[in-house]
Amino acid sequence: MKAKLNRAFTVLTGWMGRAREFVSRISGWEPAPLMGLAVVAYAGVLAADWCFHDAANVARLICFSAFQVREFVWFLSFWLLGVLLVRGLPWSMGGAVFVGAFLMHCERHCFSKGHEFARSLPTEEPVVCRVTGEVRGVPQLLGERGKAAGCRFRLWVSCVEGCPKGAATGFQMLVHWNGAAPGCGDVLRFRAQVRRIAGPRNPFQFDAASFYMREGVWAEALVLNGLNAEVLSLGDWIRFPVLVERVRSVLCEHLRIGLEDRVQTHSLLSSMMFGVHGDSLMEVREYFRDTGTLHLFAVSGLNMTMLGAMLAAALRLAGARGRFLELVVFLVVVLYAIATGMGASSLRAILMGCLVLVGRWISRPALLINSLGAAALISIVEDTNAVFRIGFQLSFGLVLGLALFGRPVASVIASLVTPDELVPRPLWKDWQWRRIRVWKPVAVAMAASIGSWISVLPWSVFLMHQITPIAMLVNLVVVPMAFVNLALGFASLLCAPFLALEHHALSGVAPLRGIVTRLNAGNGWIVDRLMSVVKGASEVPYGNVWIGYPFRKRPDFLVFDVGDGGAVLLNDGRESWLLDCGSVVFANSVVVPAMQGYGVGTIAGLILSHGDSAHLGGIDLLHNRIRIRSVLHSALKDRSPVWRKFEQRRVIDGNPVMPVVAGDVLATGEVSHLEVLYPPDGLRAALADDKCLVLRWRTKFGSVLYTADSGFTAERWLLEHRRSSLKSDVWVRGVHESDLSGTDDFVNAIEPRLIVVSDTRRRFSSPGIDEWVRRWRDAGLRVWTQRECGAVEGFVEKDGLRCVGFLRENCLLPLRPLK
């Protein structure tokens, strides 16, 4: 046995040696010990998070036979990668770093006071508590500009009275405040509804609970009336977050000079300079995401390099040299990073710059990979949760990818114009040398663009669920334009201190405002051109392709949990249909992300049941994000202003809305059959809910009946005229605004094997609905309320139809003959 282990260890060591040689040969850099330690620490944090996220995982860890192979291979891969990058690293050192990162993450995250407090709260209903604490950071105002809609801030809790396990203290809490925003450092006491931060209820929905959990926030408090809160003490007038926010606001206002009437241009410029994301950018953000240029919104090392280069040039003109120049430039860059919020990319650039600077002062040039590893290791020690944040992963992954792929790609591109290697260099012609000199910067730029695209490809696939080939070309244009934007922006900001003297009416300063105006105006012109390039590139066919999540099967039907509204996605393997799209909020946060996650970029038809804003409010947003071949709506008159506006838009586009009535068949074939059962042509009804489309989707595995918010009027007509067409396996129903729905005769005619009550927020508290659900459950029917199970997915299996609730519930409906 010992001989076999020694032989296996020898083989593994040989493989690792050959892997080291391969990495060094293709990338041109030697293995770096600090990068290896950073990767080993990363593995330790991942292991701690996985083991203690669920108690069942601890049992798997103790009982190795039940240990999941996938997680074991994942941790082992990180361990071997760390050892691969470190030449001559003792196994004991790697083990110490692994164990240290493991224990550090357990102490800071898994066993934190905030985690313990959140676990003491009930999972369903909030708890009314009396909270005392200090406001941390600057409160974030909510709502549209100029309209007071409360704020959101983080509170360092000093006491919580009324929680199930007694008073709690010493953790952060997210507070939703309704009223005038408090100041940073204010000590407050208020009564609020305290609960765990809600997680997603639909596939691919943003996981707010996980996001705030990585920030050390596990619970939230809803303050309905801020007037009843008590301010125990006011914060100091000098607070670091407040000063940073004020400085950032002053500098952003300085960039507004000359751009007062161009709000979107100024917002984009402020975002590129300081990472300030205004409301006006939401309209154009999708263009940048679809072209792979969303990095322009983040403050990165490019900003700091540009600022440092400009400041160094100015100081050299003033006669500064040596370490004094380097120190001044570094301090100014650090202050700029602090003013921008010190994001992950800014922190990485500062740490790497500090290591490079110290290396120069002690005559020990720093290696790129080693410096990157040191920066990652320091970031992990400072906050172990940093490794789970997208900003950290993208920042370090991009630099690592450029270091790994940049030189090989540049060599391949440069070889396109390089003469044959067999020809001696003295024999090269002058025109060949000129071509090489001209082509070299082009090759470097193309290598940077292609290397960046390759580096972020895993995040594009697994996070954004899309591939953007157009990004390799667009970045060749927009990055130089952004470079000019930053240069003009920093030139304008360098004039800010002198421009302040204008208020004192000093001679020779007044013309400076004209210079700043021209700089900002020129910058705004370039920003507009950049926006035009990005918008045009987003419309290039196949420049952006939705591919869906690689390891997740697309459901055959999906009932979204969209609050008061409704939305159902149908898929027969060849084409997809969408029944309603929810409100504008849910369309943006639920429907579009899910369709992108499943790779559904085109739908055969969008069928709108009625004019309720909760069912069709997001139609404009959906139309801009997804290709819709046809839109279908009831032939009855609809008074919804949102619908009328969209109907006119379709007419202008040359693809008008198709009216449908009872008896129309929208999809027919061997795979699926989609039929309209209600309303009949000429029906007169006052309420929109009485004119809802009722549709039945039938396939080889079963059928789905969608009645939206139909009431007694629709059910009576269907029983009289279309009773034989009602029988379905799954019934997706809402709740009528004021009328009775779900009568016994109607349920018996459908003979459903599963009922999904899609309405869960506004009207579900009605005693009649509660009693209806309880009565049919007692009768033996499966009735799922989306308040309890969230979204519902249906998958065709060999033995029948598998219905899965996103939060809970799971059942298999055996196949039965269809009529």
What annotation goes with each model-predicted range?
Residues 2, 178-180, 184-187, 191, ...:
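Non-globular, low-confidence helical/coil segments that flank catalytic cores
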Residues 2-119, 128, 230, 314-320, ...:
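Transmembrane helix-bundle segments that form internal channels/tunnels in multi-pass membrane proteins
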Residues 2-28, 95-295, 589-593, 602, ...:
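Membrane-interface helix/helix-cap signal primarily in integral membrane proteins
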